[in-house]
């Protein structure tokens, strides 16, 4: 009977050692993982900081073509009007002066482009973007050296009668 008690005590001590070793192993694994993330996460953050910051593009001079354009569209089945306010972004003061000097020619070209479109062609975002590109290209062909960077529609209304 005394031998049985000793065997049970030794078996119980073995379980305690096993639990202690497992806890120690988990603790070491946690410490190792923490050290890894602490050391290597800092290096990744430093790499991101070293990446060159891209400066936002510089905005040019804005020029509003006033009054707004009120144009009949090319819809065959109904009378459709478009009211569009346009602002131009120009590269520099010289281009601005040329735009101001040639504004009647520019306005005529824009009216010609808009009046050739149907309401279905310019009703969608893609259609409006295409219209902007056409206007931009036409204006830059009118100017001696181009220089209009972008065309902005600040008002865009289509009305069907």
Curated annotation (Swiss-Prot):
Keyword Membrane: yes
Highest classification ranks of the organism: Bacteria, Pseudomonadati, Aquificota, Aquificia, Aquificales
Source organism of this protein record: Aquifex aeolicus (strain VF5)
GO terms for biological process, alphabetical: bacterial-type flagellum-dependent swarming motility; chemotaxis
InterPro entries referenced in this protein's UniProt entry, alphabetically: FliL (IPR005503)
Transmembrane segments: 18-38
Function statement: Controls the rotational direction of flagella during chemotaxis.
Membrane protein topology class: Single-pass membrane protein
A GO cellular component annotation in the UniProt record: bacterial-type flagellum basal body
Keywords: Cell membrane, Chemotaxis, Flagellar rotation, Membrane, Transmembrane, Transmembrane helix
Family according to the record: Belongs to the FliL family.
Name of this protein: Flagellar protein FliL
Subcellular location(s) per record: Cell membrane
């Amino acid at each position: 009977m005394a031998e049985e008690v000793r065997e049970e005590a030794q078996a119980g001590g073995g379980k305690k050692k096993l639990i202690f070793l497992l806890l120690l192993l988990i603790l070491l694994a946690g410490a190792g993982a923490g050290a890894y993330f602490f050391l290597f996460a800092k290096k990744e953050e430093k790499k991101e900081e070293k990446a060159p910051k891209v400066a936002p593009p510089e905005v040019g001079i804005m020029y509003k073509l006033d009054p707004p354009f009120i144009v009949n569209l090319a819809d065959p089945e109904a009378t459709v009007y478009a009211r569009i306010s346009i602002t131009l972004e120009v590269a520099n003061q010289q281009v601005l002066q040329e735009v101001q000097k040639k504004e009647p020619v520019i306005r005529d070209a824009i009216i010609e482009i808009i009046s050739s479109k149907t309401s279905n062609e310019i009703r969608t975002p893609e259609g409006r973007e295409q219209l902007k590109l056409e206007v931009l290209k036409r204006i830059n062909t009118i100017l001696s050296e181009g220089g209009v960077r972008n065309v902005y529609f600040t008002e865009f209304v289509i009305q069907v009668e």
